[in-house]
């Protein structure tokens, strides 16, 4: 039966998203201009909550469309300007380049990654040990590489594992073409194993994601905000690591203990083991690959291994912007492994570009936060506190705000405010150094609570793999909860109880030298 034109428009709006979801987005679009007219500050926070809602409902509808509509309206009604949005995008161009080029570069190294991690999967039989290995490897890599790059590697590996089992459970051979997003062809007897395998991969993904936070907070190059805070404070690579150590070492140890505990006790969705049927398929796949590996295939693996070394050295030594190193990986990997047609190149960009567009929308919301000064009351309250209370309050304020906003933005806002206080002689240099540690750890650790706190977590949530593993916003928050509590609380007590005495001991031991005055440069926000 034909439908009316009006119903056709309604049906087309946000596609196959549920009707209640479409109604909610339309309601947001109607309410926001009214709220902005009545109270711009409240309207700004309402927009932040609405954007978080679109992220939470990512499995109902990709957040780009509803979030984009809200962002466009925000610019139109004057909550922010197109110029401010452009400023945010320009300020974060390195992150955007990373997403476009680095994720595509990792795609062309899939064979090597699958080779290495398949060996790891079939040789380590203990799930707890395997989880610990994923967490440790992610932490080590994230201390020197960007967390987004590490998560891109983990997603590539998990997708490869999932595709192998899905293909076999659908009655196909290893060499056959197969669509691993379609469950209709999965044999009934294999469905339970598939669900168990999803739970297994979900837990590994989350352990790896938390690992990026554990490692990323430790070094100057681990996270973008680390670099901003380190530059503002005038710290070298070594000094940064030493100053963070009173907080990062206890947090790292407790994070690894949490990994072991949730796996052993099977809490919060962890503890799922690799089904024997899946292990046998992985072992068969490994033997199939080994038997069929030609000299040309071996040459490709060697080339990819050499490129991986270049990738790690290039990023760890900051030889170029991350995105440009990613572009060099694309050029080297394709030219030296025989990929020379546009169609094959195009596939590599499919995963990253939707998220790149979503991140641009996210920066539009950050522009609203800046223009409407949504964080100013919290910042003023913390700076007005007594010096003895400031460390704990800065840690808490940064942590809470980083759960709802980009932690790079939060860290940048706070370090600039503290730097201004130092230049105005409101605080001394010793207090500034301690506050910088509290800000850095506050933005990095509690932000694991939600996917919008860290770009790497958001990338994982909105990746093509998330719906395959049934990894929703709510499930990510639930699985991150034990880590949020442990990392957040251990970080808080370390800042409150250990940071001051340990830093004093570092001075006395000669590991640190006191700074005199403020560093010369105070860069603009972002």
Curated annotation (Swiss-Prot):
Name of the protein in question: Na(+)/H(+) antiporter NhaB
Location(s) in or outside the cell: Cell inner membrane
InterPro entries: Na+/H+_antiporter_NhaB
Principal place of residence: membrane
One GO cellular component term: plasma membrane
Secreted in keyword set: no
Membrane-spanning ranges: 25-45, 52-72, 89-109, 130-164, 204-224, 242-262, 305-325, 350-370, 391-411, 448-468, 479-499, 505-525
The family this protein is said to belong to: Belongs to the NhaB Na(+)/H(+) (TC 2.A.34) antiporter family.
Function as written in the Swiss-Prot or TrEMBL entry: Na(+)/H(+) antiporter that extrudes sodium in exchange for external protons.
Gene assigned in the entry: nhaB
Swiss-Prot/TrEMBL keywords: Antiport, Cell inner membrane, Cell membrane, Ion transport, Membrane, Sodium, Sodium transport, Transmembrane, Transmembrane helix, Transport
Catalytic activity: 2 Na(+)(in) + 3 H(+)(out) = 2 Na(+)(out) + 3 H(+)(in)
Domain of life: Bacteria
């Amino acid at each position: 039966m034909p439908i009316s034109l009006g119903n056709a428009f309604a049906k087309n709006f946000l596609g196959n998203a549920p009707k209640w979801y479409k109604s909610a987005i339309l309601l947001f679009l109607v309410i926001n201009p009214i709220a902005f007219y009545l109270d711009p500050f409240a309207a700004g926070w309402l927009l932040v909550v609405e954007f978080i809602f679109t992220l939470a409902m990512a499995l109902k509808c990709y957040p780009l469309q509803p979030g984009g509509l809200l962002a466009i309206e925000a610019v139109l009604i004057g909550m922010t300007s197109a110029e401010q949005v452009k400023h945010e995008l320009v300020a974060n161009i390195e992150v955007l380049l990373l997403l476009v080029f680095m994720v595509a570069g990792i795609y062309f190294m899939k064979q090597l990654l699958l080779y290495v991690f398949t060996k790891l999967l079939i040789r380590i039989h203990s799930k707890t040990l395997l989880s610990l290995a994923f967490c440790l490897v992610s932490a080590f890599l994230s201390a020197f590489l960007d967390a987004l790059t590490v998560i891109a590697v983990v997603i590539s590996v998990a997708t490869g594992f999932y595709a192998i089992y899905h293909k076999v459970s659908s009655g196909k051979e290893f060499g056959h073409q197969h669509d691993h997003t379609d469950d209709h062809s999965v044999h009934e007897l294999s469905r339970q194993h598939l669900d168990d395998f999803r739970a297994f991969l979900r837990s590994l993904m989350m352990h790896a994601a938390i690992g990026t936070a554990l490692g990323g907070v430790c070094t100057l190059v681990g996270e973008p905000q680390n670099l901003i805070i380190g530059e503002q404070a005038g710290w070298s690579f070594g000094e940064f690591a030493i100053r963070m150590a009173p907080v990062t070492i206890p947090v790292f140890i407790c994070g690894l203990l949490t990994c072991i505990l949730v796996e052993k006790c099977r809490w919060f969705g962890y503890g799922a083991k690799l089904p024997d049927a899946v292990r046998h398929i992985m072992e068969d796949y490994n033997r199939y690959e080994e038997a069929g590996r030609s000299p040309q295939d071996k040459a490709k693996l060697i080339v990819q291994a050499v490129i991986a070394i270049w990738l790690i050295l290039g990023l760890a030594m900051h030889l170029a912007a991350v995105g440009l190193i990613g572009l060099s990986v694309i050029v080297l990997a394709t030219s030296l492994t025989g990929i020379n047609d546009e169609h094959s190149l195009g596939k590599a960009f499919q995963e990253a570009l939707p998220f790149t567009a979503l991140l641009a929308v996210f920066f539009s919301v950050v522009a609203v936060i800046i223009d409407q000064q949504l964080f100013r009351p919290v910042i003023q309250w913390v700076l007005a506190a007594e010096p003895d209370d400031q460390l704990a309050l800065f840690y808490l304020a940064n942590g809470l705000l980083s759960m709802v906003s980009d932690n790079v933005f939060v860290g940048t806002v706070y370090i600039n405010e503290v730097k201004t206080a130092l230049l105005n002689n409101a605080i001394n240099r010793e207090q500034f150094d301690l506050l910088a540690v509290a800000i850095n750890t506050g933005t990095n650790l509690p932000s694991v609570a939600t996917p919008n706190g860290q770009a790497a977590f958001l990338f994982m949530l909105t990746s093509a793999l998330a719906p395959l593993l049934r990894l929703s916003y709510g499930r990510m928050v639930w699985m991150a909860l034990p880590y949020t509590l442990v990392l957040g609380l251990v970080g808080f007590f370390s800042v409150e109880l250990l940071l001051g005495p340990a830093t004093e001991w570092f001075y006395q031991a000669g590991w640190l030298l006191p700074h005199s005055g403020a560093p010369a440069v105070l860069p603009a926000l972002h």
